[in-house]
Regions:
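Structural motif
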Residues: 6-10, 40, 86-88
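PLP-dependent aminotransferase class I/II
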Residues: 66-144, 148-151
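Structured helix-beta-strand junction loops
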Residues: 2-3, 35, 63-64, 101, ...
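A short, flexible beta-alpha/helix-coil linker loop
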Residues: 12-15, 122
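Alpha-helical structural signal in soluble globular domains
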Residues: 27, 31, 59-63, 138, ...
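Conserved PLP-binding catalytic core of the aspartate aminotransferase-like
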Residues: 132-133, 141-173
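Active-site pre-lysine segment of PLP-dependent enzymes
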Residues: 1-3, 15-39, 43-74
Length: 173
């Protein structure tokens, strides 16, 4: 659409957990380039998938200045209070503008140390991924057994639809 400056894509989608195929992400990037828009891809939950690295749009960075990829330590490593994430982009001018618009304080020493330590936790990451792969169908089956409609997804979360009466009952509690 004319006048569009940025398109934002969650990979996997939040709240459905659905994945966009890499070819679709690339086609979306090419369309953004054609109209002068930036494609921002939030890959913060992609790290939970064993095949996440292969689904990342990182390989598209070398040929496009219209791509921003957002990543976070806070999700996979359970460090929400540390507030540590990063942005990948090959457009140095855009990065400079983002840096200038950012918060005036630097990342704390504690956050830096936590991030560096997290990078060495490959065994932890493998265990978390395996646990999610094993427990996602168990949780989905349990929700279905309660009569809830579960939307199949690949993320570490599930979207389900409950009857209106359940929502009303929970609000009253």
């Amino acid at each position: 659409h004319p006048g569009t400056n940025m398109v934002f894509l969650c990979q996997p989608n939040n709240p459905t957990g659905q994945l966009a195929e890499p070819a679709l992400v690339e086609a979306l990037l090419r369309r953004c380039e054609a109209v002068g828009a930036v494609l921002a891809v939030d890959e913060c939950f992609l790290d939970f998938l064993p095949e996440g690295e292969g689904l990342s749009a990182k390989h598209l960075l070398k040929n496009s200045k219209k791509l921003i990829i957002l990543k976070a330590f806070t999700k996979l490593y359970g460090m929400a209070g540390v507030r540590l994430g990063y942005c990948l982009c090959s457009d140095t001018e855009l990065l400079a503008r983002m840096r200038a618009a950012g918060q005036p304080w630097a990342i704390s020493g504690l956050a830096q140390a936590a991030g560096i330590a997290a990078l060495d936790e490959t065994e932890y990451v493998a265990k978390v991924r395996a646990l999610i792969e094993a427990q996602r169908p168990v949780l989905a089956d349990g929700l279905r057994a309660l009569g809830l409609r579960v939307i199949e997804g690949r993320a570490n979360y599930l979207l389900f639809r409950a009857p209106e009466a359940l929502g009303e009952a929970l609000r009253r509690k």
